[in-house]
Swiss-Prot record:
Principal place of residence: nucleus
UniProt EC number: 3.1.-.-
Residue span of region Disordered: 350-382
Binding site for Mg(2+) 2: 179, 181, 233
Organism classification: Eukaryota, Metazoa, Chordata, Craniata, Vertebrata
Protein name: Flap endonuclease 1-A
Length: 382
């Protein structure tokens, strides 16, 4: 779910923090991709006659087709993706997960009614609401990525938190996910729509955290409190406080505790046993991989292994899989070229104008070769 209404709020109050780019702008970039979010998208979008793709045994293959072709698209544009898989959800998410189970149960009832009535549109709508990423989906995608030569990371907890940690450590340029809470976890750069269908023609949205908090006029800790007031996966919100009111209150009172001390509690009742402090700690000190020992390696694809798995087991077209493997191998060589800005360590907030100037100068010269991205120190909670 992420953070309720955060993208719209940033667009309204800090529009300069959002840039829109074409996928070609990310040549030479390493990006941490939220795997579970991608797989969910593929299960929803990659369909035939309203149903997920399946092999002859009735096994779902939509996630594999989506992962294979979207990854190739990124690699063809010089992007080096690393997929990050969710680990065990935090205990504080149990309430949100219970709500999702209830919504699925309700969708099952509505689907039955739609099937009895023969309502085609409703059948498709409620079928999509039942989509859930399973352990098998994850394991099959990991196997596919290994054969493609693409690295992946198993997060100990939330994938978005580990994506953010990889960005802060200088291992990758950005976190790619539709969940806005990657910003709350502290990723300096968030990309949305990177793995969206090409047919949708959606520009990639690039959010810069430093510019968000600078333009709103708050600190990162206050931004986390703001996100908690907007609504997250980890605790309830104060009913009656919308986005505009939340910003005004944070600017005026600085912390949620001070807000509680100063608002009319009859008008704005605070949830009983409200876990906002625990939620804040989870955002500021999340459980993530040790980035100091995390190595990301992009290697040659295993064409024969891909054919055995995708064609032998999953019954995809051999010609298409071999063609895809050759594209991976070809573009892997091309993407070893680096970006000019990889040679410079950026400190603090960089304006989009300066970054564009640097990139335009770099594109006019012969691209330099580099052995990787500069490694930075990762500090939890920043």
């Amino acid at each position: 779910m992420g953070i309720h209404g955060l993208a719209k709020l940033i667009a309204d109050v800090a529009p300069a923090a959002i840039k829109e780019h074409d996928i070609k702008s990310y040549f030479g970039r390493k990006v941490a991709v939220d795997a579970s979010m991608c797989i969910y998208q593929f299960l929803i979008a990659v369909r035939q006659d309203g149903n997920t793709l399946q092999n002859e045994e009735g096994e779902t293959t939509s996630h594999l087709m989506g992962m294979f072709y979207r990854t190739i698209r990124m690699v063809e544009h010089g992007i080096k993706p690393v997929y990050v898989f969710d680990g065990k959800p935090p205990q504080m998410k149990s309430g949100e997960l219970a709500k999702r189970s209830e919504r699925r149960a309700e969708a099952e009832k509505l689907l039955e009614a739609a099937e009895e009535a023969g309502e085609v549109e409703n059948i498709e709508k409620f079928t999509k609401r039942l989509v859930k990423v399973t352990k098998q989906h994850n394991e099959e995608c990991k196997k596919l990525l290994t054969l493609m030569g693409i690295p992946y990371v198993d997060a100990p907890c939330e994938a978005e938190a580990t994506c953010a940690a990889l960005v802060k450590a200088g291992k990758v340029y950005a976190a790619a996910t539709e969940d806005m809470d990657a910003l709350t976890f502290g990723t300096p750069v968030l990309l949305r729509h990177l793995t969206a269908s090409e047919a949708k023609k959606l520009p990639i949205q690039e959010f810069h955290l430093n510019r968000v908090i600078q333009d709103i006029g708050i600190t990162h800790e206050q931004f986390v409190d703001l996100c908690i007031l907007l609504g997250s996966d980890y605790c309830e919100t104060i009913r009656g406080i919308g986005p505009k009111r939340a910003i005004d209150l944070i600017r005026q009172h600085k912390t949620i505790d001070e807000i509680i001390d100063n608002i009319d509690l009859k008008k704005y009742p605070v949830p009983e046993n409200w876990l906002h402090k625990e939620a804040k700690h989870l955002f500021l000190e999340p459980e993530v991989v040790d980035t100091d020992i995390t190595e990301l390696k992009w290697i040659e694809p295993d064409e024969e292994g891909l054919v055995a798995f995708m064609c032998g087991e999953k019954q995809f077209s051999e010609d298409r899989i071999r063609n895809g493997a050759k594209k991976l191998a070809k573009n892997r060589q091309g993407s070893t070229q680096g970006r000019l800005d990889d040679f410079f360590k950026v400190t603090g907030s960089v304006s989009s104008t300066k970054r564009k100037e640097a990139e335009s100068k770099g594109s006019a010269k012969k691209k330099a070769k580099t052995g990787g991205t500069p490694a930075g120190k990762f500090k939890r909670g920043k």
